[in-house]
Amino acid sequence: MNVFNTASDEDIKKGLASDVYFERTISAIGDKCNDLRVAMEATVSGPLDTWINFTGLDEVLKLLEGLDVDLYAIPEGTILFPRDANGLPVPFIRVEGRYCDFGMYETAILGFICQASGISTKASKVRLAAGDSPFFSFGIRRMHPAISPMIDRSAYIGGADGVSGILGAKLIDQDPVGTMPHALSIMLGDEEAWKLTLENTKNGQKSVLLIDTYMDEKFAAIKIAEMFDKVDYIRLDTPSSRRGNFEALIREVRWELALRGRSDIKIMVSGGLDENTVKKLREAGAEAFGVGTSISSAKPFDFAMDIVEVNGKPETKRGKMSGRKNVLRCTSCHRIEVVPANVQEKTCICGGSMQNLLVKYLSHGKRTSEYPRPKEIRSRSMKELEYFKDIS
């Protein structure tokens, strides 16, 4: 039995983290398993009014690797709407093989991509709001610690410049990012806490001093400017009961620092931020952001997985589109069209070339290529995001 209330890797691999009706269905099929080869596709049921930064595929591949299945998917870090130009559902993943070999993993597959994609998409929206200013993912404390690496990885792919989690940072091959906690000021007092923080800031790290524990933020900022010659950031994590007009407070602090010739000290803000508040605070003068709950607890996308073909024949349930499909995207205008799987490319209505986004990642359970590292996936994501700057 696991110590914490989580499924182990082995539990997931055994299909124990699945809805029981999949297990019962496979048991009921029995000897007919060998004769039932299917193609299943994962599409989004909602929300449909926003684009999605597709994330979580890495874990799907780890789960299905070694099984006799073929898997096609849109690459992680690809950003697109869940419906094509004609209103058809976009298949993000297609798995082909014997149903009894992989059907019990439907729950896990959906869980991997629903939550990770929700987090990375929210991070991408914060990325757009922050502009060129850095923002960091500080939200793992709001979710179960067992999934903290997944949260940090997804936030990083979505656009976070760094993450606070030790395991999450290791997963993305980055150094974890942190400032100083209120606890340090409470235990030692502000001045001693600030000195200790600066003394322990390593070369290459940015020094960040928290200024809202006991003092008025303006006077704390002035005090720091007078006490220290080199400080990279002051951080305002002002609680909502004291915050008032946060934009006005930031402008006030910014003014006082500039008046004293300390425009070199930048302002970082945190506490209850999302893409809407980040945009307003950036316009007010904030230059870095710590974003937590809105990213780590982002609403998951409602992916669903459905059989679309049985033994080579198009078959599916009511409300779904039967048959294996490809997803074509125009290299010029980014128009998306869902087409039958035998169509690999076509000319777009704009005259550009439409190419298939689906990539074959597993062939009979074996990897077809080396999987990209998180940094490479993030790079793809940031290039994709350029197209969505003016699209809500």
Curated annotation (Swiss-Prot):
GO molecular function: metal ion binding; nicotinate phosphoribosyltransferase activity; nicotinate-nucleotide diphosphorylase (carboxylating) activity; nucleotide binding
Reactions this protein catalyses: nicotinate + 5-phospho-alpha-D-ribose 1-diphosphate + ATP + H2O = nicotinate beta-D-ribonucleotide + ADP + phosphate + diphosphate
GO biological process terms on file: NAD biosynthetic process
InterPro entries cross-referenced by the UniProt entry: Aldolase_TIM, NAPRTase-like, NAPRTase_arc-type, Nic_PRibTrfase-Fam, Nicotinate_pribotase-like_C, Quinolinate_PRibosylTase_N_sf, Quinolinate_PRibosylTrfase_C, Quinolinate_PRibosylTrfase_N
Binding site for 5-phospho-alpha-D-ribose 1-diphosphate: 240, 272, 293
Residues recorded with modification Phosphohistidine: 182
UniProt keyword annotations, A-Z: Ligase, Metal-binding, Nucleotide-binding, Phosphoprotein, Pyridine nucleotide biosynthesis, Transferase, Zinc
Enzyme nomenclature, EC number: 6.3.4.21
Binding site for Zn(2+) 1: 330, 333, 350
Record's comment on post-translational modification: Transiently phosphorylated on a His residue during the reaction cycle. Phosphorylation strongly increases the affinity for substrates and increases the rate of nicotinate D-ribonucleotide production. Dephosphorylation regenerates the low-affinity form of the enzyme, leading to product release.
Sequence positions that bind nicotinate: 21, 138, 179, 235
Residue sites binding Zn(2+) 2 per the record: 330, 348, 350
Pathway the protein takes part in: Cofactor biosynthesis; NAD(+) biosynthesis; nicotinate D-ribonucleotide from nicotinate: step 1/1
Subunit architecture: Homodimer. Forms a trimer of dimers in the crystal.
Domain notes from UniProt: Consists of three domains, an N-terminal domain, a central functional domain, and a unique C-terminal domain containing a zinc knuckle-like motif containing 4 cysteines.
Function recorded in the entry: Catalyzes the synthesis of beta-nicotinate D-ribonucleotide from nicotinate and 5-phospho-D-ribose 1-phosphate at the expense of ATP.
Similarity-based family: Belongs to the NAPRTase family. Highly divergent.
Designated name of the protein: Putative nicotinate phosphoribosyltransferase
Species per Swiss-Prot/TrEMBL record: Thermoplasma acidophilum (strain ATCC 25905 / DSM 1728 / JCM 9062 / NBRC 15155 / AMRC-C165)
